[in-house]
Amino acid sequence: MMEWIDENSSLFVPPVCNKLMYGEGQLKIMFVGGPNTRKDYHLEEGEELFFQVKGDMCLKVLEKGKPKDIIIKEGEMFLLPSRFNHSPQRFENTVGLVIERERLPEEIDGLRYFCEDGVTVLWEKFFHCTDLTQIAPVIKEFFESEEHKTGKPSKESSCSINVDTETELMEPFPLKQWLKDNKDSYRSGSMAIFEKGEFKVHAHGSGEQEGHSQGEMWFWQLEGKATVNVDEITRELNKNDVLMITAGSDFRVKREEGSVGLSITVDSLANK
């Protein structure tokens, strides 16, 4: 993974600032750099998982209807629930991992701008998102709008997404420290980091894991070595190697003593 980040480092600066590692299936695995400070807020019906690989970032949100800044430091992980207004602010010489899921056919995304009070919607547009390149034309549309010129909304919000105004967000946490604190619980097995919502994130220790993937499954080998067999094809994973197992695959993973790995899957209907 780190080698891939180095190879694509030219894309983590303006004007691009991001690169998709995996994106053909359910899981959208991308890396994002900066500087990229923005005024727009994104609203989607799925969760987003953040991990800061290099440097810190600020995620602006509306929590219980009030503006809030969440600082995600290098090495920290954070899960943003479904249907939360959020605006990622990224700084120079930083790289972050962001995982989203494929949108269901009936789902829409929203791009919103707020007035100076931070809570009144100035302008918004909703659309079915199949590609993140759709966002740039929407931003352009806002800057050409009367609302941008006057700073005053011209109509009431028409948001059809049931925006979350009740959840108190978790604090970002250092992944390495979590793994250290919970080592006895997954040393020879596995333990859930997240499992109640859409994203199912598990830490795995030494031993074997096998099954049939109903959906996509992304592996990230954090420490030590692992051998992964997918539909009779074998691959060796070393530290920071990653692998996507496609939906409908039979797999078997064997991790050596002292090995630590993460697996990530998604249930798109979990928060419906």
UniProtKB/Swiss-Prot annotation:
Catalyses which reaction(s): 3-hydroxyanthranilate + O2 = (2Z,4Z)-2-amino-3-carboxymuconate 6-semialdehyde
Top-level division of the source organism's lineage: Eukaryota
HAMAP family: 3_HAO (MF_00825)
SUPFAM superfamilies xref list: RmlC-like cupins (SSF51182)
Annotated positions binding Fe cation: 42, 48, 86
InterPro entries the record matches: 3hydroanth_dOase, RmlC-like_jellyroll, RmlC_Cupin_sf
A biological-process GO annotation: anthranilate metabolic process
Residues that coordinate or bind substrate: 48, 90, 100
Function description: Catalyzes the oxidative ring opening of 3-hydroxyanthranilate to 2-amino-3-carboxymuconate semialdehyde, which spontaneously cyclizes to quinolinate.
Molecular function in Gene Ontology: 3-hydroxyanthranilate 3,4-dioxygenase activity; ferrous iron binding
Name of protein: 3-hydroxyanthranilate 3,4-dioxygenase
Origin species: Nematostella vectensis
Keywords per UniProt: Cytoplasm, Dioxygenase, Iron, Metal-binding, Oxidoreductase, Pyridine nucleotide biosynthesis
Annotated compartments: Cytoplasm
Its EC number(s): 1.13.11.6
Family (UniProt): Belongs to the 3-HAO family.
Linker: annotated span: 155-169
Cofactor: Fe(2+)
Region spans: Domain B: 170-272
Region (Domain A (catalytic)): 1-154
Binding-site positions, O2: 38
Metabolic or biological pathway, per its Swiss-Prot or TrEMBL entry: Cofactor biosynthesis; NAD(+) biosynthesis; quinolinate from L-kynurenine: step 3/3
GO annotations of cellular component type: cytoplasm
NCBIfam families to which the protein is assigned, alphabetical: anthran_nbaC
